[in-house]
Amino acid sequence: MSGGKGKAGSSEKASTSRSAKAGLTFPVGRVHRLLRKGNYAQRVGSGAPVYLTSVLEYLAAEILELAGNAARDNKKSRIIPRHLQLAIRNDEELNKLLGHVTIAQGGVLPNIHQSLLPAKKAKPGKASQEL
């Protein structure tokens, strides 16, 4: 006759994180803590950190996918700040979102103004054949 709480009859399940419940990789608990400590509002609802975490995870995945494509185009296997810069500046929506953001070691987009390019000359042989 044992009177204490034993492990034999215990059917407690392991706790699941809010990130796992929402199907996210980024930490919902950490975002909730940062929202509370950041003095953004007196109270923070339970759905707000889940929503914010999912938005952050989506943005990170989008940028990393485009940067990975830029790295593959340059025949590199490692993403560097230059690839992030190319990915963000070549995407219209990301460029609008991060327009005033400076990426260290990102460089600039290759662009030569049309007036600086040499003028194309018409081929004389082609004009005589059209008549």
Swiss-Prot record:
Cross-link (Glycyl lysine isopeptide (Lys-Gly) (interchain with G-Cter in SUMO)): K126
CDD domains: HFD_H2A
Keyword annotations of the record: Acetylation, Chromosome, DNA damage, DNA repair, DNA-binding, Isopeptide bond, Methylation, Nucleosome core, Nucleus, Phosphoprotein, Ubl conjugation
GO biological-process terms attached to the record: DNA repair
Region Disordered, residue ranges: 1-22
GO molecular function: DNA binding; protein heterodimerization activity; structural constituent of chromatin
Modified residues (N5-methylglutamine): Q105
One Pfam family matching this protein: Histone
Annotated positions of the N6-acetyllysine modification: K5, K7
Subcellular location: Nucleus; Chromosome
Residues modified as Phosphoserine: S128
PROSITE patterns from the UniProt entry: HISTONE_H2A
Post-translational modification as stated in the protein's UniProt record: Phosphorylated to form H2AS128ph (gamma-H2A) in response to DNA double-strand breaks (DSBs) generated by exogenous genotoxic agents and by stalled replication forks. Phosphorylation is dependent on the DNA damage checkpoint kinases MEC1/ATR and TEL1/ATM, spreads on either side of a detected DSB site and may mark the surrounding chromatin for recruitment of proteins required for DNA damage signaling and repair. Gamma-H2A is removed from the DNA prior to the strand invasion-primer extension step of the repair process and subsequently dephosphorylated. Acetylated by ESA1 to form H2AK4ac and H2AK7ac.
Recorded GO CC terms: nucleosome; nucleus
Superkingdom field: Eukaryota
InterPro entries: Histone-fold, Histone_H2A, Histone_H2A/H2B/H3, Histone_H2A_C, Histone_H2A_CS
N-acetylserine found at: S2
Entry's free-text remark on domains: The [ST]-Q motif constitutes a recognition sequence for kinases from the PI3/PI4-kinase family.
Family designation: Belongs to the histone H2A family.
UniProt subunit comment: The nucleosome is a histone octamer containing two molecules each of H2A, H2B, H3 and H4 assembled in one H3-H4 heterotetramer and two H2A-H2B heterodimers. The octamer wraps approximately 147 bp of DNA.
Miscellaneous note of the record: In contrast to vertebrates and insects, its C-terminus is not monoubiquitinated.
Official protein name in the record: Histone H2A.2
Species this protein is from: Scheffersomyces stipitis (strain ATCC 58785 / CBS 6054 / NBRC 10063 / NRRL Y-11545) (Yeast)
